Amino acid sequence: MDIKKILAEVKRGCAELIDEERIEKLIKNYYEKGENFFIKAGFDPTAPDLHLGHSVVLTKMAFLQKHGAIVQFLIGDFTGQIGDPSGKSATRKKLDKEQVLINAKTYETQVFKVLDKEKTQIKFNSTWLNELGAAGIVELTSTFSVARMLERDDFTKRFKEQSPISICEFLYPLLQGYDSVALKSDIEMGGTDQKFNLLMGRQLQRVYNIGKEQAVIMMPLLEGLDGVNKMSKSLNNYIGVTEKANDMYAKILSISDELMFRYYELLSQKSLEEIAQIKKDIEQSNLHPKKAKENLALEITERFHSKEEANNAKSEFDRIHSQNALPSDMAEFEIQGKIWLAKALVECGLESSTSAARRSISANAVSVNSQKVSDEQMYLKQGEYILQIGKRKFAKLKVKE
């Protein structure tokens, strides 16, 4: 087995890797001695759905599962009630335990679309953090100083601005680090925004003398559909892993050619050699970028749905955009009495608010019965309408007297 080749795939797309020698040794020991190793990634269930940005870490862990890794998928049901302060400019609102547990349950079903279930352990950090007790918390806090905490950019900024920083926010990185002590993890993965917390795990493993210091793999934050900002539900530039196959396929096709290769690097399970060949074929005009994007969309959609659903999504997309046909699964709505178009777009689920609807209208993105609309004050009277925003959002509306 070519360990160097495997390591090159591990490093692919990484923003930073700490203790590469340890990772190489862990993989080597698996092939020479049959020894598995543990790789941890923590997810605070602060929202019910994961998106492709979250799956960057999952994809890397799925690769490592093929080479000896047992994934410790850690659901931060305890820390999720605090909220990770990383990158935040204000104290986060605490979530109640019931909502955290509801969100956590949905995570379990979503991650196995990427991870090998037989090589994955689902862990909840309340298991050991509830047992830590006051004495344990005091001992834990004694391992780190306030001065070190204030080295974090987000805390420093808030401290200088005299914005509130709660004590429990100081506790968050300590508790996340203690997770690595409890789990005896060999590797921890996370985004670049998690570096402080990830290094805390290494330090606490040393302090608690568990006989190992975890290596750290940091992945970059995936850009959203706009190609500029990180993928985020709040920015509406995300692709949810539970989205319908048709929507997932269409959204991936909407990304730029430049962003396509970023997605290939971070989300595709194709090898480095295969991706290099795709780039070469495009450069030599042997492969059209659109075809490469279609292949990527098929691969990712199949991962979260099925091969049949992915192929059906492609056929549906081609039918709509090549033949100017309407979606076969278009939602239908009925409304009594004439209605303001902006409100109709919200009622039909095409926009989240009338403000957003008005922005779409002013941006010339809204069509009514295939005709572009620019009048933000337009009303729909009795009749049947096909409402459309952009290339992907459709709804059929019947306005009754």
Curated annotation (Swiss-Prot):
PROSITE patterns: AA_TRNA_LIGASE_I (PS00178), S4 (PS50889). The keyword Plastid does not apply. It is found in: Cytoplasm. The keyword Transmembrane does not apply. It comes from the Bacteria. Keywords: Aminoacyl-tRNA synthetase, ATP-binding, Cytoplasm, Ligase, Nucleotide-binding, Protein biosynthesis, RNA-binding. ATP binds at K233. It catalyses: tRNA(Tyr) + L-tyrosine + ATP = L-tyrosyl-tRNA(Tyr) + AMP + diphosphate + H(+). A motif ('HIGH' region) lies at residues 45-54. One of its GO terms (cellular component) is cytosol. A motif ('KMSKS' region) lies at residues 230-234. One of its GO terms (molecular function) is ATP binding. One of its GO terms (biological process) is tyrosyl-tRNA aminoacylation. It is an enzyme of class 6 (ligase). Pfam families: SYY_C-terminal, tRNA-synt_1b. Residues 339-399 form the S4 RNA-binding domain. Its EC number is 6.1.1.1. InterPro entries: aa-tRNA-synth_I_CS, aa-tRNA-synth_Ic, Rossmann-like_a/b/a_fold, S4_RNA-bd, S4_RNA-bd_sf, SYY-like_C, Tyr-tRNA-ligase, Tyr-tRNA-ligase_bac-type. Catalyzes the attachment of tyrosine to tRNA(Tyr) in a two-step reaction: tyrosine is first activated by ATP to form Tyr-AMP and then transferred to the acceptor end of tRNA(Tyr). Homodimer. PANTHER family: TYROSINE--TRNA LIGASE (PTHR11766:SF1), TYROSYL-TRNA SYNTHETASE (PTHR11766). HAMAP family: Tyr_tRNA_synth_type2 (MF_02007). Belongs to the class-I aminoacyl-tRNA synthetase family. TyrS type 2 subfamily. This is Tyrosine--tRNA ligase. It comes from Campylobacter jejuni (strain RM1221).
